[in-house]
């Protein structure tokens, strides 16, 4: 099954590559090239990008910042990533619009649902920055929210690992990978793939979640084509 309208969730860490901080232009270019192949097949693609490669609100809060303030700083970090991703996409010929939940009219469009959907219908990629515009909500929750709003058929969470495991595969050799699992299993077992609000939103709106490795070339195209390359939550 090939999906026709997809919400791709990119973590900020995915844009770091092997760097300890910031944005790796080579990784952005690689992601942009993969996305260009997907859009070239008449797939409508929206992207929500995180900001953890620059600033993470929870970490700032743990270090003594006011939580709401820290989250707003994190939202600004996601806008930096969104603009960088737009640049990479446009350099490979993909028409792209950035929409932000917090208005920044000099650098991006404000988030307007109908305008976003119109961009998708015209074959443009829409990158959502600024989270959902409110503190205390993760960019995973933003991805679930935007997916429901634009009627996406699936949320694709691109990560550093090749699926969902019962424990950290980088720390435990006997970690078990799930091919398919239910929303309820993720919630009940507190599997750390997305926060519970994001999972519940997808569950309530019957939006499946595919988790896969972003660093393997061509995986975005394979995921959109419905290939079993990671883990599917439904």
UniProtKB/Swiss-Prot annotation:
Q: Please state the Enzyme Commission number of this protein.
A: 2.7.4.22
GO process annotations (BP): 'de novo' CTP biosynthetic process; UDP biosynthetic process
Q: Where does ATP bind?
A: 9-12, 52, 56, 159, 165, 168
Activity-regulation annotation: Inhibited by UTP.
GO cellular-component term (any): cytoplasm
Please give the catalytic activity noted in the UniProt record.
UMP + ATP = UDP + ADP
Q: Which UniProt keywords apply?
A: ATP-binding, Cytoplasm, Kinase, Nucleotide-binding, Pyrimidine biosynthesis, Transferase
Q: What is its main location?
A: cytoplasm
Q: Which GO terms describe its molecular function?
A: ATP binding; UMP kinase activity
As for subcellular location, the record says: Cytoplasm
Sorted alphabetically, which InterPro entries does this protein's record hold? AceGlu_kinase-like_sf (IPR036393), Asp/Glu/Uridylate_kinase (IPR001048), Uridylate_kinase (IPR011817), Uridylate_kinase_bac (IPR015963)
Positions of UMP binding: 51, 71, 132-139
Return the Gene3D superfamilies for the record: Acetylglutamate kinase-like (3.40.1160.10)
Determine if Repeat is one of this entry's keywords.
no
**Keyword Phosphoprotein appears in the UniProt entry:** no
> So, what pathway does this thing act in?
Pyrimidine metabolism; CTP biosynthesis via de novo pathway; UDP from UMP (UMPK route): step 1/1
Q: What does this protein do?
A: Catalyzes the reversible phosphorylation of UMP to UDP.
Record's PANTHER family?
A: URIDYLATE KINASE, URIDYLATE KINASE PUMPKIN, CHLOROPLASTIC
Q: Family membership, please give it.
A: Belongs to the UMP kinase family.
Q: How does it assemble?
A: Homohexamer.
Protein name in UniProt: Uridylate kinase
Q: Which species does this protein come from?
A: Prochlorococcus marinus (strain MIT 9312)
Q: Which gene encodes it?
A: pyrH
């Amino acid at each position: 099954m090939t999906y026709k309208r997809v919400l791709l969730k990119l973590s900020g860490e995915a844009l770091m590559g092997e760097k300890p901080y910031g944005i790796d232009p080579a990784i952005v270019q690689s992601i942009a090239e993969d996305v260009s192949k997907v859009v070239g097949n008449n797939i409508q693609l929206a992207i929500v990008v995180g900001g953890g490669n620059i600033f993470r609100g929870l970490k700032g809060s743990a270090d003594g910042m006011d939580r709401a303030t820290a989250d707003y700083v994190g939202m600004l970090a996601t806008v930096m990533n969104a603009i960088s991703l737009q640049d990479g996409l446009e350099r490979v010929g993909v028409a792209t619009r950035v929409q932000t939940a917090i208005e920044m009219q000099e650098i991006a469009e404000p988030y307007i649902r109908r305008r976003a959907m119109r961009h998708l219908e015209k074959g443009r990629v829409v990158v959502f920055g600024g989270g959902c515009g409110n503190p205390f909500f993760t960019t995973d929750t933003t991805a679930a929210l935007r997916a429901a709003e634009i009627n996406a058929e699936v949320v694709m969470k691109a990560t550093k690992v090749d699926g969902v495991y019962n424990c950290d595969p980088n720390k435990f050799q006997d970690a078990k990978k799930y091919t398919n699992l239910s929303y309820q299993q993720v919630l009940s077992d507190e599997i750390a793939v997305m926060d519970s609000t994001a999972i519940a939103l997808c569950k309530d709106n019957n939006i499946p979640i595919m988790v896969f490795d972003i660093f393997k070339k061509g995986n975005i195209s394979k995921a959109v084509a419905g290939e079993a390359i990671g883990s599917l939550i439904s």
